[in-house]
Amino acid sequence: MEKALLLLSQAMTLGTTGCMFHSIFMENENYVNRSLQRKSGILLAGSLLYLSLPVHVAAIQGQRDWTQIGIWMLLPVLITALIQMTHTDRKVWRWSFGLVAVLVTGVIGRMDGVAGLTVLFLICIAGISRKRWEYPVIGVLGTGLAYPTYLTWKHWIIDGNFAESGLEYVSIMNKGYSIGGLFSTYFHRNGNPGMGILLMSCLIFLLYCTFVKGRKIRTGADTVWLLAVALLTFMSLRYFPWDHVQRMGQWSLGLVSLIQTPTVFFTYAQIVLCVLSVEKIGSIAMTEKTQKELKKAV
């Protein structure tokens, strides 16, 4: 039964991820003019990269963490809803997609409080990069729906009842990644997955196109996202001063202990890099194909 549920969840994740990349590529004119077969190939390749990230594989095979499996399935739904909300001209559809985004954000916050706050941060980054004031509002409303999670946190951290959480005050600084661990092809230390060879290959290819081929790939919005990725990655390292943060007071000691491991932040950095990589590589491939077709026509 569990295996059947696992297969169903991954099939649903494949579908939601395909919808996410379809929404992203709809902003690209070259994608709109492609045949259904080519569109499907691009979407399938991007979805498989998302599903094959080692941190996702670890949640399925090693830990069998249903909370993380659910979050990986819901994140593409959230991204799709946010993008579609800005594209549709009908007010009813805008409100509908906005409501879906709020609900999904709330569900993620109820499933995992740390994930909920990280997603709120990324939604605000999306609002800055796309210049959409609605995004932070949606993020705040969605986080508000998860208020039972954070009321429980308050009871544990502020009211001095941390023992009821079933956790202990711990230092998480030594649980972070080393620099080399970020680039490991699969598992690093303590079972923490690196970014994997597929994502690393995509990033190397984009660096090659930028610095060797001289392509202008990066935009101003991408810079905002890369800064967010850099911050999340730094927070996941064993060099980030989590011990100093914990010394700020009893509340900070409890809050950091609830995080349990800083490697969680690199998970979301990888997701952002995955989405950006698929978008850029797909755009490059479609642009080259269009140029070849134009040359043949001439």
Language-model regions, residue ranges each:
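Membrane-embedded transmembrane-helix bundle of lipid-linked glycan/lipid transferases
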Residues: 1-298
